[in-house]
Amino acid sequence: MRYYLTPLLLFIFFLHPSFANSLPSVPHILVIGEYEIRATPDILTLSLSISETGTEVAKARDSIEARSKELISSLKNIGIEKKDTSSAQLQITPHYNWNNRAQIYVGTEVSRTVEVILRDLSRYDDLIRSIIDAQVAKIHSSRLSSSKEKTLREDALRGAINDAMTKAKIMVAHLPEQIGPVYSISPQSTNTPFPGARLQMAEMSKQSAFEPGTIFFKESLQIVFYLVKEK
């Protein structure tokens, strides 16, 4: 079996000098395979903040504790399991104003962050009512995901491999070489974002229409194949 380097591949090799140290010194071809799967999300994760500011720390703390318990109890009533809720420790932050270089105490903020995972999006309206009733101050973040994420990512990876194989075959279809063994496979960073639910507290009390939309699972990889001379 002999290796043969074509003018085209010489051009590709010198076009990408940054790859010189990671590529074989014999004829080869480098391809990028990509594949994307669209899916309808079925899980919503929210990070919520319950807070209150006052000059009496104990009173503010008791209010946060009561509202936290109300929220957790309400979430349980709509079918959200204990494992799908988590509460952080209370955060106590004093606030001051400055007047003529003098520091004036104006109150202390007591807050707690609660994370909620909703696995049945048909209960979204119930979740919103629970959040409003508990006087949640802010939604820090929201994330839509799929319960089939592992399977979908594996399918996307298989698709990316097939895409790379197809591209490689097309590129050498009219050349005197053929695709040989694989030299290396390297994953490429895709950082596919999950769309946020775009929830605003000011709008929640007016309407709770919610469309989960679509999320994407994208995989990308780089494959280097040896090129071998056709027999």
Which residues does each PLM region occupy?
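Short, charge-dense linear interaction motifs
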Residues: 2-4, 15-231
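Sec-dependent N-terminal signal peptides
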Residues: 5-10
